[in-house]
Regions:
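Active-site-adjacent pocket-lining segments in enzyme domains
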Residues: 2-40, 52-151
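Acidic/histidine-rich helix-loop elements
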Residues: 44-51
Length: 151
């Protein structure tokens, strides 16, 4: 079975977490949820994350990039401000990228890509307030709703 992982934290943008969570399940992925806090949290709009109360939340120390086929990084600027400070999470993202596996980054989740130093020379779409940060990190910023560049 294919495995996906969603990495985020408290105050993630609810729909940016929930939609990929259920879409992965619908596509028969086993989905792990790794939250900075190591326990269920609330989204920015108050939704329980993960939405399934029986879903076990993992800590970053419990996960290995070798075990997953896809990584999802939902947005939520308040969450990303804290998540990007966790060096173990940043290393996970960097190691995942080094294996050329799919990374789906939504909105301000691109902050994690900047911190992992994996945006240089890549087309990246992100929340408009991150445009300067992405360009300064070497990304080719686009305001398209979605973009694919390599993995």
């Amino acid at each position: 079975m294919r495995k996906g992982i969603i990495i985020s934290g408290n105050l993630a943008q609810d729909h940016e977490f929930i939609y990929p969570y259920y879409r992965l399940l619908e596509e028969d992925f086993e989905v792990d949820v790794c939250l900075l806090e190591g326990k269920p949290v609330k989204g920015f709009l108050g939704t329980d994350l993960p939405p399934n109360k029986n879903h076990k939340v993992k800590k970053i120390e419990e996960v290995n990039p070798n075990d997953y086929d896809i990584l999802v990084l939902p947005g939520g600027v308040k969450a990303m401000e804290k998540v990007r400070q966790n060096l173990d999470i940043i290393k996970f993202i960097s190691d995942f990228n080094a294996q050329n596996k799919i990374i789906a980054c939504i909105c301000s989740g691109a902050q994690l890509l900047i911190s992992a130093k994996i945006v240089k020379g890549r087309k990246i779409a992100g929340y408009y307030s991150m445009k300067d940060d992405l360009i300064n990190a070497g990304a080719i910023y686009t305001d398209l709703p979605a973009v694919v560049d390599r993995n």
